[in-house]
């Protein structure tokens, strides 16, 4: 098979591992920087050009699209879909998961457990907004933040009001979520592939920090998840329409709660924590599904 990987840096761990796994199985691999692509959009023969070359003959494409280039990256991926190339994750599914509000609304519609969440732009009654989610302490998030950036724990009502007013001054849309104290600064990253959780790790925030992101110094260890957690992670990925997803769960007194569904989950932390060949499993999945062209929208979304 000829497999394309949409990535801006072939030296990144996840990209490098996918290349190694694909080549080890005899596939031809080409890494493409989506931002450097340009497209010929027409009714007869849609094309993608890259460094003067017409990209054609691909059987599958693996999108590793960074959050900052979601719009253009998904546009290029959609063009691949229109050309009949199998996407591991569809453009419309990635777009859903990158919109934090939309993704939570989709999870809500499907009845997937998640923290009580308020969404606001210019609330005229901040006190009522806080009471709506159960009062302080609360977690306040910028809608566009990633890797723990733009996430604040406000431990008192006064602090929460100050943070919300500051974010309002930036003309930013914000989410206000209940703080799950019993999680103890830890979350669980479930790596979903197809309709299965193939690996899971526990991420623990460093002392004095509540954000467990590995980019913020959190540590990762192997964890055994419950059947309910497994079911919740798969349901969350399915709600987005993702074949490959990193689903972040919190363990709460009322069961697993989904914090986020990531469409380009990193491989380094979870491969090291679990000792599993996640990259190889992704390529195996492509081998089994690409020939069926099993996409829901085929670029129509």
UniProtKB/Swiss-Prot annotation:
One of its GO terms (molecular function) is ATP binding. Mg(2+) 2 binds at residues 260, 262. InterPro entries: ATP-grasp, ATP-grasp_RimK-type, ATP_grasp_subdomain_1, RimK, Rimk_N, Rp_bS6_RimK/Lys_biosynth_LsyX. Binds 2 magnesium or manganese ions per subunit. It holds the Pfam family Rimk_N. Disulfide bonds: none annotated. Its EC number is 6.3.2.-. Transmembrane segments: none annotated. Mg(2+) 1 binds at residues 248, 260. SUPFAM superfamilies: Glutathione synthetase ATP-binding domain-like (SSF56059). One of its GO terms (biological process) is translation. The keyword Ligase applies. Mn(2+) 1 binds at residues 248, 260. PROSITE patterns: ATP_GRASP. ATP binds at residues 141, 178-179, 187, 211-213. Keywords: ATP-binding, Ligase, Magnesium, Manganese, Metal-binding, Nucleotide-binding, Protein biosynthesis. GO terms for cellular component: cytoplasm. Mn(2+) 2 binds at residues 260, 262. Residues 104-287 form the ATP-grasp domain. Its cofactor is Mg(2+); Mn(2+). Belongs to the RimK family. This is Probable alpha-L-glutamate ligase. The gene is rimK.
